């Protein structure tokens, strides 16, 4: 008997979708006045990123994870339009647009973030970053996990040339 074809089985009310996103940027020179922003949190004493936007790789990775579920390209399409027509470089605005692309029966239930970079020092601001992500995604703080690694000098990120982020999102979709 094939369970998929058995109409006597109850239809699940929720299905789970998993989105994955990645982003990375190189640092600007040390003399740059552009701030280093990660998850909407400013890291003093670290240069900003080479990017048309504020370069927030964490919010960008989350946008890409949402796009992997919604099939609506935010970075490269929506964000570029916002930048070129309205001058918007704030990645939190791009993230808001990504969230709007979710269907009305979809909601983010968990975010797992991993960051690789030799600088800045992530640990002192991990709590603020988690709070910022939870607020932006409208999910409980306990539903946001962040890990960070220095990279031990094994990649450009580990050597301090930039920072890389991966994001996995769990998205619940009601189908009842």
Swiss-Prot record:
Keywords: Isoprene biosynthesis, Lyase, Metal-binding
Domain of life (superkingdom): Bacteria
Single GO MF annotation: 2-C-methyl-D-erythritol 2,4-cyclodiphosphate synthase activity
Protein's UniProt keywords contain Signal: no
Pathway: Isoprenoid biosynthesis; isopentenyl diphosphate biosynthesis via DXP pathway; isopentenyl diphosphate from 1-deoxy-D-xylulose 5-phosphate: step 4/6
UniProt-annotated binding residues for 4-CDP-2-C-methyl-D-erythritol 2-phosphate: 23-25, 149-152
A Gene Ontology biological process term: terpenoid biosynthetic process
Annotated signal sequence range: none
EC number: 4.6.1.12
Cofactor mode of binding and number, as noted: Binds 1 divalent metal cation per subunit.
Database matches in InterPro entries: MECDP_synthase, MECDP_synthase_CS, MECDP_synthase_sf
Site, as annotated: Transition state stabilizer: 52, 150
Presence of keyword GTP-binding: no
Reactions accelerated catalytically: 4-CDP-2-C-methyl-D-erythritol 2-phosphate = 2-C-methyl-D-erythritol 2,4-cyclic diphosphate + CMP
Known cofactor(s): a divalent metal cation
Amino-acid positions noted as binding a divalent metal cation in the UniProt annotation, renumbered to this chain: 23, 25, 60
Protein function: Involved in the biosynthesis of isopentenyl diphosphate (IPP) and dimethylallyl diphosphate (DMAPP), two major building blocks of isoprenoid compounds. Catalyzes the conversion of 4-diphosphocytidyl-2-C-methyl-D-erythritol 2-phosphate (CDP-ME2P) to 2-C-methyl-D-erythritol 2,4-cyclodiphosphate (ME-CPP) with a corresponding release of cytidine 5-monophosphate (CMP).
Membership in a protein family: Belongs to the IspF family.
Assembly description: Homotrimer.
Protein name: 2-C-methyl-D-erythritol 2,4-cyclodiphosphate synthase
Source organism per UniProt: Chlamydia abortus (strain DSM 27085 / S26/3) (Chlamydophila abortus)
């Amino acid at each position: 008997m094939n369970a998929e074809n058995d109409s006597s089985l109850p239809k699940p009310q929720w299905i789970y979708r998993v989105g994955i996103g990645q982003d990375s940027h190189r640092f600007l020179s040390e003399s740059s006045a552009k701030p280093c922003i990660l998850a909407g949190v400013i890291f003093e004493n670290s240069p900003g990123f080479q990017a048309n936007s504020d370069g927030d790789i964490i919010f960008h990775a989350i946008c890409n994870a949402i796009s992997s579920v919604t099939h609506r390209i935010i970075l490269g399409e929506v964000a570029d339009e916002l930048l070129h027509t309205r001058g918007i470089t704030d990645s939190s605005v791009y993230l808001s647009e990504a969230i709007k692309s979710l269907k009305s029966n979809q909601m983010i239930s968990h975010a797992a973030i991993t960051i690789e970079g030799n600088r800045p020092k992530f640990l002192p601001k991990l709590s603020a970053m988690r709070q910022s992500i939870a607020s932006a995604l409208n999910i409980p703080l306990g539903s946001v996990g962040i890990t960070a690694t220095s990279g031990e000098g094994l990649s450009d990120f580990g050597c301090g040339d930039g920072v890389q982020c991966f994001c996995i999102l769990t998205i619940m979709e009601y189908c009842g």
